[in-house]
Structure formats: C-alpha cells, structure tokens
C-alpha cells in the first residue's frame, strides 16, 4: 500500500512536531510554501514567477519540483523539473493544494491530509467555494482513501458527504502507520 502525506500550503504543525517520523512513513507533498519549514519531498508551484525563482534557487536539486507544462516551456525546459498539465478557468484559493492533491493521488493509495482548513463557512468567497469544490472532486474521483488529520471543526458539506474520507489525530495516524510498518 502506497501512502502520501499532503500538506496544505498554510500548514502549521504543532510546536515541536518533527516531520521526520512522517517522512519515514511516506513522502510529503505540498506547495512550495511548505518546503522550507517541512522539507517537503514533492513541491508544487503553479505561479510562473515563483517557479522561475525556485528553479534559480536550486529547488529541483533538493526536492521533486512540479510546475505547469506551459511555465516549463517558457523557462526553456529546466532539468530535473517535473511538469503537469491543466488550467483553471475561474478563481481558486490555494491552487497548489489542488494540484498537489491530484498528483499525490496519482501515486498513493492512501493520502493523509495535514493542515487543511475544510471548515464550513457561510457566505464564503467564490474562490474558497471553488477550492472546496475542486478538492472534494479530486478526493471523490481519485478512488483512493483520504485521511484528514487534526481537523476539529465541522467539514464543509462537499467534503463531509464523501465516502472515501476519514478523520483522525496525527499521533494516532503516526502510531498506526508505525505499527503496521514493523
């Protein structure tokens, strides 16, 4: 069984929480914003200007960097950089999270989501509504099992209705996965 950790771009792990136990279990996917704090193994960057900066800083040497194919071509196809296709025809919060969800689900059977704010919000901005909807669609269509970690509040309805998603606490998930790897 292949497992992947998926960190939301605004993830804040509890103080003192080392990511090494997570990394010992499975690779970590997330936005470029998570790489420095959490040493994300697989880094997604949708933004063309930021992708150019990351390439210049050598991110492709320290992680698996994923950028849009169109950006890759405009940057003269830099070595060691991975590409993905697709586009967004409407405004979406945290595009990197959506792309990372799709990519991680393409290689893992179980995706463990950390740091995601999936709380129901009345009168949410359309960009947030689109984010929740696209994330729910990615989870539903993947056919994989998803685990939301440390999310104490009620989930937004499109996420709550999914049959392939569960919730748990990070210490429980780490203990369960460590026990299964022995």
Locations of regions flagged by a protein language model:
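Metal-ion/cofactor- or nucleotide/acyl-coenzyme-handling active-site neighborhoods
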Residues: 1-182
């Amino acid at each position: 069984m292949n497992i992947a950790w998926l960190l939301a771009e605004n993830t804040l792990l509890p103080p003192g929480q080392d990511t090494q136990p997570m990394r010992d279990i499975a690779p970590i996917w997330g936005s470029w914003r998570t790489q420095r704090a959490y040493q994300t193994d697989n880094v997604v960057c949708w933004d063309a200007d930021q992708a150019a900066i990351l390439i210049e800083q050598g991110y492709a040497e320290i992680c698996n960097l994923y950028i849009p194919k169109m950006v890759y071509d405009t940057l003269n196809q830099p070595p060691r950089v991975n590409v993905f296709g697709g586009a967004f025809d409407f405004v979406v919060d945290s595009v990197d999270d959506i792309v990372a969800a799709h990519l991680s689900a393409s290689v893992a059977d179980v995706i463990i989501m950390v740091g995601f704010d999936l709380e129901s919000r009345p009168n949410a901005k359309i960009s947030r509504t689109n984010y929740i909807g696209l994330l729910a669609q990615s989870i539903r269509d993947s056919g994989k099992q998803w685990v939301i970690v440390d999310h104490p509040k009620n989930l937004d309805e499109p996420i709550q209705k999914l049959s392939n998603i569960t919730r748990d606490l990070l210490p429980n998930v780490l203990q369960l996965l460590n026990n299964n790897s022995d």
